[in-house]
Amino acid sequence: AASENVEVRFYDPVDLLRPWKLNYRLHDKYLIADGERYILGGRNTSDLFLGSYQEKRNIDRDVLVVSNGSENSSVRQLTAYFESVWSQPENRTIKGRASEKTGALHERYESLRENCPAAFADADWEEMTMPVARVSLLHNSPRAENKSPELWDTLCRLMEQGDDVLLQTPYLICNRAMYGDLAHLAGERQVRILTNAVETGANPSGCA
C-alpha cells in the first residue's frame, strides 16, 4: 500500500459496533488493463490459485474480453462498477511502509521473466479471442447492506427467453424462492447447471 502508484482499500472493514455487517464482503475477481481488456473469473489472489502449482494444481475458468473501449462496451461497464465499489464510504485506505518482502517480489518477477518468456511476449489479442455480438456485465448494488435480488431477477428474465439454459457456477446456494424459480424455468425449457463436485469444491454445501 506504500508503493509508488499503488493504492489499496479495504471494502467495508470489520466494525465491532456493527456486527450485523460482518458478512458483507466482496467476492469479485477481475483485472482491467488499460481500459481495453479484462480478465474475469473465480481465482482468489493466493498461491493456490496463481502460484507455480508445484504441489497442487488448481484449475479455474476465466474469461478474457478484449474491447475497443467504446462507450457501451463491457469494459466500460466493469470500470464503472469498480469505481462505484472503490468509492463506497465505508471503505478504508491502507497506509503503511513498504514491506521487507519487496525485494523477494522483484526476484520472483525476474525469475518469471527468465523461466516463462512466453508470458511476457507480445500477444495477438485478435488471434487469441473470438468475436461476439455483445458482452454485458450484471451485478447487484455495491452497497454493504441487505440487497434486493436484482441480479437473480435479471438472470431469470434472461433464462425465460431461452429454450436451452446452461448455468455455470463454482457452487450453488439457493433459498426456497430461488429453487421455485428454477423449477418453474425447468418446466418449460431444458435447464442444466454445471458446478463443482463435493470432492473438489471449496464450499461442499454448495456443490453437487
Question: Which residues fall in each region the model found?
Answer:
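Charged, low-complexity intrinsically disordered terminal segments
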Residues: 1-28, 33-208
